Amino acid sequence: MPRLSAAVIYLLVILGVSALVALAWQAYPVSGSQRLRCQPACAQADLRSRNLAAADLSYTDLSWATLESANLRGATFLLSVLSGANLRESNLQSADFSNARLDRVDMRRAILVDANLRATDLRSADLREADLRSADLRGAQMSDVRLERANMQGVLLIDAQLERADLYRADLRNADLRQANLREANLRMANLDGADLTGADLAGALLPHGYTEPLLQSDEEP
């Protein structure tokens, strides 16, 4: 096999480095605006720890992207695809995910206070220990979602599909779960004080100790 000359090797190294720089650069926000150079095709982009507050990421493919610990407060993800994305410990307060695809997303310990997740696809998402206080999840598809120990005080889950969802030790105080589908959901040790489950489907669900269907009133002495 012929040996490569030093000049050829040097050229290959330069080309390789240039390609890596180009890939890294496209993930940064464009100067003076909160959009990404890679938009609308940002699949698998590495955006960890980036400051993207109030960014407009609508209609963007961010599937399998890494957004861990990113500041996305007030960002917009209208109709975006984030399937399998890593949003662990990211700040998503007041973010708008209207009609976005978030299936299999990793949002463990993410901040989603006041976030708009209405009609989103969150099937098989991991939201363990996430802060979802006052988030809007009306009509969301959440079958097989993991919400263990999540803070869901005051969350709106009207008409949400939560079949087989794991809500072990979730804080659901004052949550609105009217007409929600909770078939075979795990609600053991969940705090349901003040929650509204009018019309909710609890068939096969594991309920907190001391609670029974259909009105989910506590059987324990006050």
Locate predicted features.
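N-terminal Lys/Arg-rich, disordered targeting/topogenic segments
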Residues: 1-5
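Tandem repeat scaffolds
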Residues: 28-222
